[in-house]
């Protein structure tokens, strides 16, 4: 959605076009709730890239950087948004108290980042190890994830590099409109990316993940 530059924020009024199995399953759940009508009260939260303790996808990035490699995909501008898990928890409780029935609220930390921002902060928290930053064309990722998906089906173990991961990484616009969450729920993110990454990396270290 809204992949043309200059990128615009995605709002609840845009027609969802999920490109992963996970995203499609969430949309099916939303449509089911919408079909019930007002007889069943519900509120939908749509957090963007959630990170924090126990999260595994961003942990793999941290692990790779610790091993001196950072991998990025695509040469077209990519605007990314994130939300720390504690801010998601805050939004859940606020939605229970103040959310409007049937509404859909996007969640992020309110900022927009370029693709290298997250890995640069991870590198800083790891003590600035030497790092080789590799940026590959999208078609290279397509080949890698194709074989990752194939091997996962053959072995019965899902590869981290699969078709869903390809669709996530190739998307360029992750901007989202959090104004409704702020205005109606009283949501105010407390964890900017630098603080959140610091806490996440500390947890990974303290718990033996890194």
Regions found by a protein language model. Name each.
Residues 12-15, 62-73, 128, 154-160, ...:
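A short C-terminal helix-loop "cap" of Rossmann-like NAD(P)-dependent dehydrogenase/epimerase domains
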Residues 176-184, 188-210:
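Amphipathic terminal alpha-helices
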Residues 24, 28-29, 55-60, 73-96, ...:
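Substrate-positioning beta->alpha
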Residues 85, 120, 145-188:
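Conserved C-terminal active-site "lid" loop/helix of NAD(P)H-dependent oxidoreductases
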Residues 4-50, 70-74:
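Catalytic helix-loop patch of NAD(P)-dependent Rossmann-fold dehydrogenases
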Residues 95-161, 194, 198-201:
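Mid/C-terminal beta-alpha module of Rossmann-like enzyme folds, strongest
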Residues 1, 50-52, 88:
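Conserved sequence/active-site signature of Rossmann-fold short-chain dehydrogenase/reductase
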Residues 20, 80-86, 113, 176, ...:
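Residue-level signal for the nucleotide or nucleotide-sugar donor/cofactor binding architecture
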